[in-house]
Design a protein with these regions (language model features):
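Alpha-helical transmembrane segments and their membrane-interface boundaries
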Residues: 1-61, 105-106, 111-114, 121-134
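Hydrophobic transmembrane alpha-helices of secondary-active transporters
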Residues: 15-20, 70-78, 100
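Small-residue-rich segments of transmembrane alpha-helices in multi-pass membrane proteins
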Residues: 37-48, 68-72, 91-105
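Short, Lys/Arg-enriched charge-dense amphipathic segments
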Residues: 53, 75-82, 102, 132-134
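Alpha-helical transmembrane-segment detector that highlights a single hydrophobic TM helix
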Residues: 56-84, 90-91
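Membrane-embedded alpha-helical core segments of multi-pass
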Residues: 70, 95, 117-125
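Membrane-helix boundary connector in multi-pass membrane proteins
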Residues: 79-85, 96-111
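A general structural signal for short secondary-structure boundary/capping elements
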Residues: 83-86, 120-122
Length: 134
């Protein structure tokens, strides 16, 4: 793989994760800027490496990344006496790892569609919360 392609993939993931992480940081969310960038860029780098190595078990490696990120997301859950908060944050961490993997594999169209769906979901969720719906 050409160096320019690797840089493009990593920078695209960095830039889009930066935007999302900045928005979360600005809104004082418990998990913000750094986490989303590091998770997605790390996943992207591992996907690039796996595809470069042509491993027979690269799918298993990528699956292990997604599973491992699930544990990181679980750390974002906050329990009070009668409620649990942070499911959207946990799911966001998980989907950003998948976003990074997909871009790392060179699936730009699919990655950008996922990124768009993430924003639509988060903005819709905020709208519903702000209007006490649900």
């Amino acid at each position: 793989m050409e160096t320019n392609t690797i840089v493009l993939r990593l920078f695209l993931v960095f830039a889009l994760s930066f935007i999302y992480g900045y928005q979360r940081q600005k809104n004082h969310k418990p998990v913000g800027f750094g986490t989303f960038i590091l998770v997605s860029v790390g996943a992207c780098a591992l996907a690039i490496t796996a595809s470069e190595m042509n491993l027979d078990n690269s799918v298993a490696l990528l699956g292990a990344i997604v599973t491992g990120i699930g544990f990181l997301g679980a750390g974002a859950l906050i329990k009070t006496s009668d409620k649990i908060f942070g499911f959207t944050t946990a799911a966001s961490i998980w989907i950003f790892a998948i976003f990074g993997l997909i871009i790392g594999l060179g699936k730009y169209r699919e990655g950008l569609i996922i990124y768009l769906i993430i924003w639509i979901t988060i903005l819709s969720d905020k709208y519903l919360e702000d209007h006490a719906i649900g």
